[in-house]
UniProtKB/Swiss-Prot annotation:
Entries under InterPro entries matching the protein: Ribosomal_uS2, Ribosomal_uS2_bac/mit/plastid, Ribosomal_uS2_CS, Ribosomal_uS2_flav_dom_sf
One cellular component (GO) term of this entry: cytosolic small ribosomal subunit
Biological process annotations from GO: translation
Species the sequence originates in: Vibrio campbellii (strain ATCC BAA-1116)
Coiled-coil residue spans: none
The gene coding this protein: rpsB
Name this polypeptide is given: Small ribosomal subunit protein uS2
Domain of life per record: Bacteria
Classification via SUPFAM superfamilies: Ribosomal protein S2
Amino acid sequence: MATVSMRDMLKAGVHFGHQTRYWNPKMKPFIFGARNRVHIINLEKTVPMFNEALAELAKVGEKKGKVLFVGTKRAASEAVKEAAIASNQYYVNNRWLGGMLTNYKTVRQSIKRLKDFEAQAQDGTFEKLTKKEALMRTREMEKLEKSLGGIKDMGGLPDALFVIDADHEHIAIKEANNLGIPVYAVVDTNSNPDGVDYIIPGNDDAIRAVQLYLNAAASAVTEGRNKDVAVVAEKDGFVEAE
């Protein structure tokens, strides 16, 4: 099963929080101390909390649940997309549009528009338009792809959110809370852990740390999905005799 060790976390700089003056007192239970006016996160708390989160994510995968990876700041954006694609899941890595979850009906209409444009671009419809009209549609398609490309095949609300930077993505977390969707989030020393079901106390800025969280989460979801496949195969008698 996907797990992360303290050594992995130390190497990735998970323990480095924000400057002490920016701290959120609600993160006090997860802080080890301070060095050079920077809070140090207690990895003895983070390691078991993250591994518990990974075990739960694997269960989501096993039930064929949908995980939405969210991280829109520069340090996380590309890694969020890669993790979602690697685990056959979904992502928002550009900008969280208000109502993406709570007003999913409207979002679904925009996704339909995006898919219509994609079909038109493929079947030659764009070529029959005037240059100006084709350019306008192409631009709108690109804009929609940037915002909704990572969720266009989600086909409904997700079963879990995996968030990088609880502070930056507080709107996404609030929407998930309103709908009862479990939230797994990396929470740094400057963030509010309220509303996060599975808190992962850790650095949310260092690219190596961000990649560590995302790679482990993607692996956990994939392992869960594959476990389900193995169980089905066993039931169907595909298991070879020793």
